Structures are given as structure tokens and as C-alpha cells.
Amino acid sequence: MRRKNTKTNYLLEKIASLLANEKRGKLLDLGCGDGDYSFRLKEPGFDVIAADLDEKRFKYRNEINFKVCDIAKPLPFPDEAFDYVIAAELIEHLKNPYAAIGEINRILKRSGQFILSTPNVLSLKSRLRYLFEGCLEYFREPPLEQSKNPKEVIFNLHLIPWRYPELEYLLVNSGFVIEGIFTSVYEGWGWGFVLPLILFQAWQKARRSLKKGGLDYRRINKILLSKELLFGRHLIVKVRKWGGVAGG
């Protein structure tokens, strides 16, 4: 039975749109939570398996295959078992993200796709919050105090604020090719008055580096100064496993 949700989940709909034109196949919703993402992606015909540590939160036991899974340990799936893996708002919670991303690569088929999202800590809104509060957007609660709350709250503990450059490094060094960078919804246009200063600083940094024979920042600056990174609520990255070509 379909469960109606009158409030639009922009992140969910964006992830669904990134898969809309892909060939249907076996999809793992890792860290599925209540299962809304799994249910949404099952509708257009994906063969969905949902996986999470807490089965009690999952709402679709009669409709979707659920697997109890501790993401901190090796995943309970064979090599190259899935065509697609999604991990929405998961990586910021992980204590050992390198091991987890390596496991995702292992269970993906050649040229399989992985879509992940995480709070966008490089947005203008987040940068200004850090300036005034000393904390980034979605990382306002002190982890030590929050960790003393009941166990169900610990599942929502944000540990690592992922900037795009570090996330890109993690993915590429785990055997993935970046295919696209997206966001869920744009916000914070009112903070655009600081944009000229940010653009000038980025230009100066790139210029000084090249002048001294250092790094070439032009590629990464194009990403960091994109509207997705400056005004997006979430950072969504779509990657493909090495070993195949798109559509292969």
C-alpha cells in the first residue's frame, strides 16, 4: 500500500531523478532509515534491497526486502552484487568512511553507479554560520554531549563535515570516477552579497599559487564556486566504479 507524504522531500526526488533514465537493475539503499527512499525507487522498477542497523524504523517490511546491516563492518553481500548503491545522508555519520566506501566499491558491479549525499558545509549559509557561531550548518550540536543521549539519538550524530575536495579524494582513491555534482534545493541567495569577496579570494589564491609554481586551482575552483556548492542545501555526488564505461 502506498503511503502518502504531503511534504516534498527534495533530496529524495533529486536522487530519484538521477536514476530515472538509467537501466533498471539491482539497487541497494544503504542506511535506509525509515525506507522512504527504498519505496520511492522501487516504484519505477528497480529491484531494491534496503539495509540498515535498526530494522524497527523501517516502514515497508511487506513490500521491500530488508537486510540488517552494520555499516561499520564488512557488508553482508557478495562481490559485484549490485548495479546501484545509494547512501543518502550517511557518510557524515561514519567513523571509518574509507572502509565503508571500499565495501561499496566491492559490492558494485563493473561500471556500477553510486550516489551519495551529505550536508553541504561549503554553502554561503554554512560559511557565515561558521564565521558567527564557530560551527558549520548541520554540525551545530557538540558531539560529546549529543553522544550521551539515548541510543536512538546517537544514530543521528554527525561526526564528519565533508568538504567536496576531501570527499572527491576519498571516492577517487576508492576506485570511483566522478560523474556529476548536484544539490537538492537552492537556498541562501540573501547571502550573495559576500560572493564578490569569495570570488576575489579564490582568484587571488589561484593566481599566487601558479605564480609560485604551485597547484593549479582552476579545476577545483570551478566546482567550489558553482551554484550547487555555494547555494545548495545538500552535496550530492554521482560516481561510477572503475572498470567499465557509461552505458556498458
Model features per residue range: what roles?
Residues 2-6, 10, 36, 40, ...:
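S-adenosyl-L-methionine-dependent methyltransferase catalytic module, highlighting the catalytic core
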